[in-house]
């Protein structure tokens, strides 16, 4: 496209966060950018586990919030955790109103599943492992019928338009070329960073574009070092790799090594139900020691596999693995980014005119390690809060804005980047590897003229090098201890390409501990 379009609100991204936000904005007009045909290539559609919500007998908002805080290893904002749990029931009602067919018990109540690090069964699912696909299908259908939404399919943002420190829309790229969308408010909802790693469960295009674009424009980004590696990606050499949902371990599946030994009890008392970072490191350790890792579902699921977990079953059978009678080979894979563009509790970033929600945002809800099945919930909760803030807000003037599109990364450099990120910024890291990675990425970024993927990788690696402790999804073999005081990390652009660490949360008057500064 070579046109200039205008709208009240521009939503960059068409996953769960972006689409649920767009629907709730009605009747305020908005444009939604979907880089692929609607419903395709969004990581939300691949989510197997479900949505966490404290709906069961004996469960509560306080318990859900406490589990979220515990999983986050000291960095979750307690007020945000409470907000997330408090809004969960209403967001489930939104999905039910759209016709999402969540699994139910014989009495008609919602079926609630147990997942790792949850103290109560509270995950609502669809046909075992089809939650993401079913939710996205319902949202896409509603979006196509919504008169206030203009959908641009096959179009992605490449840079944010800026005018006197205010974000004014985006420079976009589609099948017919580049164009401009001017907007009074712009929302980033583009997903994560898994495509920066060699083994990932994310779409390969998920390379941290929102982080790079926001940082380039001057927004504060935070907690970028915290990458969640899913412990049970199916190890069949696929790119991206399918995963074996957390719910399988919740149902009693065991992790075993080549000797058939269930090994998780050696690493954590919660065994298979330990938090994802703990399980991922255990699987990594077994594989590194040459003992391998398999998920044995034969006793817990067995012959019921096709009906209870159809997505996992199909992925296994396509690789000539029958999980009814064979253990599933597994390995950790880059799955979710806890960091992102820093926002307040209403989804506003540090730049006027710019909001963020979903995986590309850093809301304070995930800390150093996200609680299983909180990601879809967080997308909906903050998408709704942004919509509620913008729907009736006083309209600002449209601004012209300016931006320069960065070059695209070439295939050879991207392949090398993914290898380096997996090796030096993976499940286990150390200072020497991270320092070498920062040097390599910086040189590659300068040589290539600053592609967004390389900028995002440099920011992540720099944050990981700066954090000299082990916490949650960030594990340093040269600094295995956890500091007694938890601290989030915040970065902002310094000059054209430099990075400056902040000494305080941009949305809090309280300074960070002294060790948080560069």
Residue ranges and their predicted role:
Residues 96-177, 182, 189, 198, ...:
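Conserved redox-cofactor binding core of oxidoreductases
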Residues 213, 219-328, 380, 389-395, ...:
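An anion/pyrophosphate-binding glycine-rich loop and adjacent beta-alpha core
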Residues 1-7, 24, 37-39, 47-53, ...:
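Glycine- and aromatic-enriched mobile tails/lids
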Residues 185, 189-194, 360:
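Glycine-/small-residue-rich beta->alpha transition segments that form the dinucleotide
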Residues 9-32:
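N-terminal Rossmann-like FAD-binding beta1-loop-alpha1 element of flavoenzymes
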Residues 76-89, 123-141, 152, 200-208, ...:
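Short beta-strand to alpha-helix junction loop
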Residues 159-175, 180, 321-363:
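FAD-site-proximal beta/loop scaffold in flavoenzymes
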Residues 36-69, 73, 239-242:
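Conserved N-terminal glycine-rich FAD pyrophosphate-binding loop of Rossmann-like flavoproteins
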């Amino acid at each position: 496209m070579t046109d200039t379009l205008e709208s009240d609100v521009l939503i960059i991204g068409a996953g769960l966060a972006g689409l649920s936000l767009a629907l709730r904005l009605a009747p305020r007009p908005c444009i939604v950018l979907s880089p692929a045909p609607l419903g395709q290539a969004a990581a939300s559609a691949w989510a197997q586990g479900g949505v966490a919500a404290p709906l069961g007998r004996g469960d509560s908002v306080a318990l859900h919030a406490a589990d979220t805080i515990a999983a986050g290893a000291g960095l979750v904002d307690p007020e945000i955790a409470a907000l997330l749990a408090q809004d969960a029931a209403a967001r489930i009602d939104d999905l039910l109103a759209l016709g999402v067919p969540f699994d139910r018990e014989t009495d008609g109540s919602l079926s609630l599943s147990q997942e790792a690090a949850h103290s109560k069964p509270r995950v609502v699912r669809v046909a075992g492992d089809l939650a993401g696909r079913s939710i996205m299908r319902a949202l896409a259908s509603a979006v196509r019928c919504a008169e206030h939404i203009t959908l641009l399919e096959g179009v992605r943002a490449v840079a944010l338009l800026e005018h006197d420190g205010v974000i004014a829309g985006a420079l976009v790229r589609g099948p017919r070329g580049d164009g401009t969308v001017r907007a009074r408010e712009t929302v980033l909802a583009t997903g994560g960073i898994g495509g920066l790693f060699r083994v990932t469960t994310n779409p390969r295009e998920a390379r941290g574009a929102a982080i790079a674009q926001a940082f380039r424009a001057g927004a504060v980004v935070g907690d970028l070092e915290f990458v969640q590696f899913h412990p049970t990606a199916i190890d069949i050499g696929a790119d991206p790799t399918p995963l074996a949902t957390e719910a399988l371990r919740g149902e009693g599946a065991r992790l075993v090594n080549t000797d058939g030994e269930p090994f998780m009890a050696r690493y954590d008392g919660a065994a298979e139900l330990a938090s994802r970072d703990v399980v991922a490191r255990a699987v990594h350790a077994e594989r590194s020691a040459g003992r391998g890792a398999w998920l044995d579902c034969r006793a817990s699921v067995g012959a019921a596999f096709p009906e209870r977990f159809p997505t996992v079953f199909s992925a296994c059978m396509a690789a000539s693995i029958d999980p009814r009678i064979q253990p599933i080979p597994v390995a950790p894979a880059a799955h979710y980014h806890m960091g992102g563009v820093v926002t307040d509790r209403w989804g506003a970033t540090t730049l006027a005119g710019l909001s963020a929600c979903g995986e590309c945002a850093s809301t304070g809800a995930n800390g150093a390690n996200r609680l299983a099945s909180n990601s879809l919930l967080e997308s909906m909760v903050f998408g709704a809060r942004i919509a509620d803030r913008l729907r009736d807000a006083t309209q600002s003037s449209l601004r012209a804005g300016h931006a320069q599109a960065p070059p695209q990364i070439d295939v050879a450099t991207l392949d090398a980047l993914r290898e380096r990120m997996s090796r030096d910024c993976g499940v286990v890291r150390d200072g020497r590897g991270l320092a070498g990675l920062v040097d390599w990425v910086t040189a590659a970024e300068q040589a290539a003229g600053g592609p967004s993927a390389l900028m995002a990788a440099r920011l992540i690696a720099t944050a990981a090098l700066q954090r000299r402790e082990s916490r949650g999804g960030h594990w340093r073999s040269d600094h295995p201890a956890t500091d007694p005081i938890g601290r989030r990390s915040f970065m902002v652009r310094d000059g054209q390409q430099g990075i400056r660490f902040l000494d305080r949360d941009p949305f809090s008057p309280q300074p960070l501990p002294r060790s948080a500064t560069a």
